[in-house]
């Protein structure tokens, strides 16, 4: 996510770079700026509250340094990872490149995924490594995130510890998932909760509701794949707002008036 709200993730596949241990990236130990980075990290760790923006900026600086100096062996590892992960990773990387090129632009204004993917593959075939550079930067990040999470899980299991995680019922409006499969969402609606004892005005969670008929027409492939991705990392999954599979408060995207909202 671009903010600190964990349920506003830009992907149901990729891992958040915020959790990357950049000290384990190849090239970190010999970096001239290592002491400066570690001094800044110490200051950030001493804060009473997490400064998400500053943490992201520092980690991005380290990642860029290490990626720009990655050797052939490291890049071969990244390419092998990208080959194994297929379209999930490619879609994520292309999305991130578009987001960097068009900051603040809603995904509904991006060119379609199939078009962008085809153009990228065609350009890559002609220009080779140069065309890959931006895309591989994000594959590099995910490669080491997956590697670190895998090692963490192995260590936990050796000590008889299980890993449990949340699966939010919704996905971010400006996400890879909405970009790749907009037909699975009602983009003119937003999910939330009706007025109650805790919130007199109700709640607007900001993410689009699902088109369950479109989901069913594809045998719920998107959902089955989402669970499969999470099962790679987790031993147990808590579905946040499981009632959302049966009914959810739907608010017109163009209106904050809860009187126009209803359960669907």
List each language-model region with its residue ranges.
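Acidic/aromatic-lined carbohydrate-recognition and catalytic surfaces
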Residues: 1-182, 215-216
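Substrate-binding/active-site clefts of carbohydrate-active enzymes
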Residues: 154, 162-233, 247-264
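Walker B catalytic acidic pair
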Residues: 241
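Divalent metal-binding pocket/active-site signature
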Residues: 244
